[in-house]
Amino acid sequence: MAWVVVAGLTVGLAAGSVRFGWDRDNVIAPLVTTLGDLRTVPALVLAAVLADRSGLTDGLAAALATVSVGVLVVAWRIPTDRLRGIVRQSVPVLGVAAVFDLVAGLTLEKRLDDLLAAEAILVLLPAFLGTAGALGAILSSRLSTQFHLGLDDATPVPSRSSMRNIVDLVVLAVPVFVVGALVAHLVAQATGQSSPSLADLVVVTILAGGLVTVLMVFVAYYTTMGAFRFGLDPDTYGIPMVTSTLDLVGAFTLILALVAVGVA
């Protein structure tokens, strides 16, 4: 259900970027990742409710799994070279991304008691992970565009042009994470949720955000650069690996920062 909405919004944003002259690297990648998070969670809740009320859950699951495998087999063997290449490059990286996201969920589940002790952290968590993923997506998209257009060399050591993009994203990350902490604290106070002090929450967010930003730069650059150097499509590899890796490590660094500050 979620992918239908996200796919439609992606096409709309791409068309709008061309029509209105928006910077596609700064608009499409972060908005699509954010909207994906926004639509996926309600879709999962709705699907769980429908499955719980249906007496045909097992049969429906088997049918959907069969159809999915059939579609994948057809797409894998499709005669069009370009489409076949997209499918064969996308499936492995999306599979790895799914595993990373599952491990991230398991990490959060294991420390759920710590998160429930400061409910503002649960308010902050989706915004924190979404922000980290959006920033990484912007960097990966920018680098991919530069490599494709020959404006930058995909070298193991980032060039000056790549470093400018990296510095821009690092500078942008600090105020964005701080604003996220402020909003999470205000929302928690307004809804009667437990929260550490504002100072503690800001420190937790900056510590976790700093660690995540370092990893975001590393994963975004070397995934995009590596894909380009090996003749693969960096757009296919960069953003999925960045967002899924940051989901995993972002959850871990947030919990680590909670422990370091003494909130958990």
What are these model-predicted stretches?
Residues 135-192:
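Helix-loop-helix junctions within the multi-pass membrane cores of secondary transporters/permeases
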Residues 1, 29-38, 91-98, 122-134, ...:
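Transmembrane helix-bundle signature of multi-pass membrane transporters/permeases
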Residues 85-157:
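Transmembrane helical segments that form the transport core of multi-pass membrane transport proteins
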Residues 45-58, 109-123, 186-199, 256-264:
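Helix-coil boundary and interhelical linker segments in multi-pass alpha-helical membrane proteins
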Residues 2-6, 10, 36-40, 44, ...:
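Alpha-helical transmembrane segments of multipass membrane proteins
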Residues 8-30, 112, 138-157, 219-239:
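Juxtamembrane helix-loop transition segments at the membrane interface in multi-pass membrane proteins
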